[in-house]
Amino acid sequence: MRAAGLGLGIGLLLLAALAGPGGSAEQGGVPAKKLRMAYATGPLLKFQICVSUGYRRVFEEYMRVISQRYPDIRIEGENYLPQPIYRHIASFLSVFKLVLIGLIIVGKDPFAFFGMQAPSIWQWGQENKVYACMMVFFLSNMIENQCMSTGAFEITLNDVPVWSKLESGHLPSMQQLVQILDNEMKLNVHMESMPHHRS
């Protein structure tokens, strides 16, 4: 009975590890794919967002409203990646947790390899394998998510920054964003209509 429970717990952990936040292409160490690109001929509005912070839905809502109001604007969105050191830590943890879970399951003592005595927490893990595996998995996932979360919601129009959550500390309201875009579009039209003087 205990072996069946252990097998079920291990199966659930492996399934969650494959589908967990550290393993997804959107948040892992691999560069994130584009969230969406609307094919149009006008200016490019680019969003760089923290997907692991839950901003994808906000981006999709903004994109829907903006594409209705400004049909000529091209809209791109991508994951704003954290600094390389945090990406490497998250990648290391995603592999390390699987190795550690494997060692707990097979009962192999890694401390004996280094000629050290196993600490009491390792002994506890061997006596409570399911709980130990779950604890390692969820604790590691929590740290991975923290490493990958940037809190970013950066917006540029033709590579000119128009909003930065990292600087302002909050997301723009839809009204703010529309007002910013209106001002930028009017400025662009005004600049294009000015006569070019030759030197």
UniProtKB/Swiss-Prot annotation:
SUPFAM superfamilies: Thioredoxin-like. The keyword rRNA-binding does not apply. There is a cross-link at C50-U53 (Cysteinyl-selenocysteine (Cys-Sec)). GO terms for biological process: cell redox homeostasis; cellular oxidant detoxification; glucose homeostasis; insulin secretion involved in cellular response to glucose stimulus; pancreas development; positive regulation of cytosolic calcium ion concentration; positive regulation of growth hormone secretion; response to glucose. Belongs to the SelWTH family. Selenoprotein T subfamily. The chain crosses the membrane at residues 95-115. It comes from Gallus gallus (Chicken). It is an enzyme of class 1 (oxidoreductase). One of its GO terms (cellular component) is endoplasmic reticulum membrane. InterPro entries: Selenoprotein_Rdx-typ, Selenoprotein_T, Thioredoxin-like_sf. Selenoprotein with thioredoxin reductase-like oxidoreductase activity. May contain a selenide-sulfide bond between Cys-50 and Sec-53. This bond is speculated to serve as redox-active pair. It catalyses: [thioredoxin]-dithiol + NADP(+) = [thioredoxin]-disulfide + NADPH + H(+). This is Thioredoxin reductase-like selenoprotein T. It is found in: Endoplasmic reticulum membrane. Its EC number is 1.8.1.9. GO terms for molecular function: thioredoxin-disulfide reductase (NADPH) activity.
